[in-house]
Swiss-Prot record:
ATP-binding among keywords: yes
GO molecular function: ATP binding; tRNA dimethylallyltransferase activity
Taxonomic classification: Bacteria, Pseudomonadati, Pseudomonadota, Alphaproteobacteria, Hyphomicrobiales
Gene for this chain: miaA
Matches recorded under Pfam families: IPPT
Protein name: tRNA dimethylallyltransferase
UniProt record, GO biological process: tRNA modification
Similarity comment text for this entry: Belongs to the IPP transferase family.
Region annotation (Interaction with substrate tRNA) ranges: 43-46, 167-171
The protein's assembly and partners: Monomer.
EC class of the enzyme, as a word: transferase
Organism: Azorhizobium caulinodans (strain ATCC 43989 / DSM 5975 / JCM 20966 / LMG 6465 / NBRC 14845 / NCIMB 13405 / ORS 571)
Entry cofactors: Mg(2+)
InterPro entries: Dimethylallyltransferase, IPT, P-loop_NTPase
Domain of life: Bacteria
């Protein structure tokens, strides 16, 4: 049954979060087929057109089963901010609902879900020349020195950020250099959310830790068999600037080093698996602390829980 079959157009969306390799895509496909839904991506790597296999984007066959939005629509050379994703997701949800379909937002990027349901600070776009100036300044600096520099400009952000969190430290420095205001000050002026939490069904897919580790390892091996290495080779041939987000996709740095002859294939695979497992652990921690009131379930129970909540 689709949304056209009922005037009770609640919920406005279904949100499905979960760690990598937990089975989110399969769950979303099953739910979308039952609800005449549209799957909307909330994964910060799957927005890029490069590395379809390595980032575990849905296959072309899966995308033919139900409509998919915000997958592979951004070139790897481009910057893609949370603000841009919010704008794209809001448009995709509005289009789905205008068509009488249920928006099903699925992914593992916690910041996307938080911004969607709690609002986003109105930080201006950072000019490219400012970004490059900050990056050049940081090239020869260790991260703890950058963290100390941030403490003189934005003490509140420095307290909140780990001294080794180089990417977020650089982001905070860029905001200060571009706007003259601390990032923490911008964040206090958060806009109203695009989607109120109470208007959505919110679900976290959970998998037992050892089971998830095994799934991650097997999936990485399957990706290698499916052509992930060739994808990385094509991406490397583009010679993108080193700070492009897509170059940090889990497994890409290790496979790039293998292609350069700097490590063995077996070591590259092991490092890619380890990197992905560490990321999954961070995701699980995020979902536990940032989404305490979301529904939870396993791959065995999730579909029944969601369809029961939606009264299908």
């Amino acid at each position: 049954m689709g949304l056209r079959d009922s005037e009770a157009l609640k919920p406005l969306a279904v949100l499905i979060a979960g760690p990598t390799a937990s089975g989110k895509s399969a769950l979303a496909l099953d739910l979308a087929e039952r609800t005449d839904g549209v799957i909307i991506n909330a994964d910060s790597m799957q927005v890029y057109g490069d590395l379809r296999i390595l980032t575990a984007r849905p296959s072309p066959e899966e995308e033919m089963r139900v409509p998919h939005r915000l997958y592979g629509h951004v070139d790897g050379a481009a910057d893609y901010s949370v603000a841009r994703w919010i704008a794209d997701a809001a448009a995709a949800m509005a289009t789905a609902r205008a068509e009488g379909r249920l928006p099903i937002v699925i992914g593992g990027t916690g910041l996307y879900f938080r911004a969607l349901t709690r609002g986003l600070a109105p930080i201006p776009e950072i000019p490219e020349e400012v970004r490059q100036r900050v990056r050049r300044m940081a090239e020869d600096e260790v991260t703890v020195v950058l963290h100390a520099r941030l403490a003189t400009r934005d003490p509140e952000a420095a307290v909140r950020l780990q001294p080794q969190d180089r990417q977020r430290i650089l982001r905070a420095l860029e905001v200060f250099e571009a706007t003259g205001q601390p990032l923490s000050q911008w964040q206090r002026a958060t806009h109203r959310p695009v989607l109120e939490e109470a208007s959505a069904v919110r679900f976290v897919l959970e998998v037992e830790r050892e089971t998830l580790r095994g799934r991650i390892d097997r999936r990485f091996e399957t990706m290698m068999e499916a052509g992930a290495l060739a994808e990385v080779e094509r991406l490397a041939a583009r010679e993108l600037p080193a700070d492009r987000t897509i170059l940090k996709a889990h497994g890409a740095p290790a496979l790039t080093r293998y292609l350069r002859g700097e490590m063995s294939r077996a070591d590259a695979i092991a490092e890619g698996q380890n990197d992905t497992r560490r990321y999954a652990k961070r995701q699980v921690t995020w979902f536990r602390h940032q989404m305490p009131d979301w529904m939870r379930g396993t791959p065995d129970t999730a579909l029944d829980q969601l369809t029961g909540t939606l009264r299908l």
